[in-house]
């Protein structure tokens, strides 16, 4: 809680004038907001304005937020932070699995043999899950971490694919290329439960590994080893976080994780 009394914490409103933030009273700040809202609405119409609420707000505050924009401002331009964090997961999984929900519970960690964590730092962001993952790794299970950062879990990883930021799609393409090329697939499952296998197979086999290696900055041999560990494991689970979804490739990356 050191941030609470931190000297750099904002305690009074700031209004930018001539490119410089200047201190203002609360009345000045509220009057400025109101006057600008009115000016923009009169000049460009109500749809020139919009609001973004938050899942961290209670129902009452979110209700007031949407009511303000719809009834007072006169626009339906109201959204929430879930648009860039949860929605890519929901859409990606819906397109691949048919529903935007998790396929496993956290308790299934006990029954898995290999765990892949991509774009997530659960020991900091979700300590309970992070602790459960660490417990399983300490029992000898395999951990694959895909993250540009050296997170705490990366210290326990058997394979840390430290890719360049924004290259999730390329790296997952490499993994799928090796899995299909080497035949590390469960063909019976594919035949019975998937569609479009031949088109998918043709696409991933055409991946230029050398180009993907340059793009991601990850050695192809390390990617191949991680892909083999994941694909040949008797049971494997993957976890992804905001490092995947809060990205322009978010939905496509979630779809690739599902394909993997």
Predicted stretch roles:
Residues 182-212:
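Internal, active-site/partner-interface "lid" segment
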Residues 1-182, 196, 211, 219:
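N-terminal export/assembly segments and adjacent metallocofactor-ligating motifs
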Residues 156-157, 206-210, 240-244:
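Flexible glycine/proline-enriched surface loops and loop-helix/loop-strand junctions
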Residues 230-259:
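A glycine-rich, hydrophobic/aromatic-adjacent loop/helix-cap motif
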Residues 194, 220, 246:
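Conserved phosphate/pyrophosphate-binding and hydrolysis machinery centered on Walker-type P-loop NTPases
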Residues 201-206, 224-236:
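Core structural elements
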Residues 44-53, 81-83, 187-193, 214-215, ...:
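Short coil/turn segments at secondary-structure boundaries
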